[in-house]
């Protein structure tokens, strides 16, 4: 059974938000690497070029999205209270998923009640730590807005889908695994259409510090 990619939604570093801008970035060999800004997290106090320095990171550059917190919550029927603790990864999935359907020429409302599936490859939630919430501050929206398990369900719920919806974290291969699962589901007849996505937002320095301890990242931040 043949499977085709019919639409794409992108949110990538360097202002890339469609295939045309992605192609332009590649052709012009645009370098999207930049110093991690303090509004993302305070990398300056954690940086140390010595890879053996405990509790420090020898990386201070990354390719990052601009204005990652920007989100039109009302467009998706989400209240300000619910949107505030929502992991930017959830927000990006909603936006990119909607864009992918538009790019495919599929009116989103025509998928309501169908067996369309949602398959998400997602990085860990760092936004909760970034916000610095305490147990006394949290409410139900801190749970629904932060857990990886809710990410695929949120997109499926918004579109009224009845197909399989799941999120996976297989580290660097998460996006490819999501695409493979979507392909298998279509070929098995579990769904006619599938949204497959990958998302990761660096919002807390802890992962960078831990990866530096294992020397799993390049000093220049490129891999």
Show the residue positions of the predicted features.
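Cys-dependent condensing catalytic cores that perform Claisen condensation/acyl-transfer
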Residues: 1-223
């Amino acid at each position: 059974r043949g499977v085709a990619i019919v639409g794409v939604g992108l949110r990538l570093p360097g202002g890339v938000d469609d295939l045309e801008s992605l192609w332009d970035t590649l052709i012009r060999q645009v370098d999207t690497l930049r110093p991690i800004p303090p509004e993302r997290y305070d990398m300056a106090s954690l940086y140390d070029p010595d890879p053996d320095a405990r509790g420090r990171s020898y990386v201070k550059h990354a390719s990052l999205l601009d204005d990652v917190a920007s989100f039109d919550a009302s467009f998706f029927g989400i209240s300000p209270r619910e949107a505030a603790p929502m992991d930017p990864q959830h927000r990006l999935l909603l936006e990119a998923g909607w864009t992918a359907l538009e790019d495919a020429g599929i009116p989103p409302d025509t998928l309501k009640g169908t067996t369309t599936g949602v398959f998400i490859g997602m990085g860990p939630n760092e936004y909760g730590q970034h916000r610095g919430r305490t147990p006394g501050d949290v409410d139900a929206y801190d749970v629904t807005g932060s857990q990886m398990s809710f990410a695929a369900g949120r997109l499926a719920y918004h579109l009224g889908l009845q197909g399989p919806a799941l999120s996976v974290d297989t580290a660097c291969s998460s996006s490819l695994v999501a695409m493979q699962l979507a392909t298998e589901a279509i070929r098995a007849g579990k769904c006619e259409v599938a949204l497959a996505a990958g998302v990761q937002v660096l919002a807390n320095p802890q992962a960078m510090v831990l990866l530096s301890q294992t020397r799993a990242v390049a000093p220049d931040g490129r891999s």
